[in-house]
Amino acid sequence: LRKNRISYIFQGLELFGDLTAMDNILLKNRITGYKTHEEIIEMAEVLHVTSSLHKKCRILSFGQQQRVAILRALCQPFQFLFADECFSHIDRRNGEAAMELITRECAGQKAGLVVTSLGNSQEGFHEKIVL
């Protein structure tokens, strides 16, 4: 069920600290084969984490780790994406980029999105979501 229908951005991120950001992303993508390497790089550029892809996750800031977790969650087909506090440590510019990417991916898959605790920094996000 989780492989093809549900994707999740965990509040605790659930990244492997001793693996690079790219290795964490590829763990999911190797199972599904959903995204090409080029697509992953393009999404990393959108989220401004290309320079972090070959660094171990344990040395990244929490905001960078959140963006890596978002990328990992988007590397599979899904009918629903659950995002638990996935913007809490992301600045406004990167938060807007993440919202646009998530919105684009959900619309492309005609998927539903459930987001918890948006707070003020993502005001208006619900208006952009395609369910």
What is the predicted role of each segment?
Residues 11-16, 118-119:
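Catalytic "switch" loops of ABC-type ATPases
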Residues 37-52:
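Conserved ABC ATPase "signature" region
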Residues 70:
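Hydrophobic anchor residue at the start of the ABC signature
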Residues 56-60, 64:
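Conserved ABC ATPase signature
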Residues 81-84:
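Catalytic Walker B motif of ABC-type/P-loop ATPase nucleotide-binding domains
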Residues 12, 19-31:
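Q-loop/switch helix immediately C-terminal to the Walker
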Residues 77:
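Conserved catalytic motifs of ABC-family nucleotide-binding domains
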